[in-house]
């Protein structure tokens, strides 16, 4: 699915096959990765009772709007704003404890 923090198109992987979730793990991937890389991790933690959410940073994988790997001048500020937006989305939708990994 896509979320739109500050009109940026950010792809979000959501692995939610949990009947009675204990919490949500929000993954913040590294600079040379994407959220999909954590699929096996997500399936493991789904079996343990956790929903797993990992977005693609702006300019990465499915969040590319212009050039792949493009990092705007204030790129790290943008990443931080996007992650906070996603954390707030998780709080609003799931109302469960969140562990942030990354």
Which residues make up each language-model segment?
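Short coil/turn segments at secondary-structure junctions
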Residues: 25, 67-74
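Proline/glycine-enriched tight loop/beta-turn segments at coil->beta junctions
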Residues: 16-24, 50
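Alpha/beta-hydrolase fold nucleophile elbow
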Residues: 93-102
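N-terminal cap/lid segment of alpha/beta-hydrolase-fold proteins
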Residues: 1-19
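Alpha/beta-hydrolase active-site loop
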Residues: 72-92
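Active-site glycine-rich loops that stabilize anionic/oxyanionic intermediates
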Residues: 25, 29-33
């Amino acid at each position: 699915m896509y979320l739109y923090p500050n009109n940026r198109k950010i792809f979000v992987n959501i692995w939610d096959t949990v009947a009675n979730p204990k919490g949500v793990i929000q993954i913040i991937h590294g600079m040379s990765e994407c959220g999909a890389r954590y699929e096996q991790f997500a399936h493991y933690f789904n079996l343990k009772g956790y929903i797993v959410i990992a977005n693609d940073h702006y300019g990465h994988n499915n969040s590319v709007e212009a050039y792949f790997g493009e990092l705007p001048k204030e790129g790290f500020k943008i990443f931080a704003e996007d992650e906070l937006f996603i954390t707030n989305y998780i709080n609003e939708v799931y109302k469960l404890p969140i562990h942030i990994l990354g």
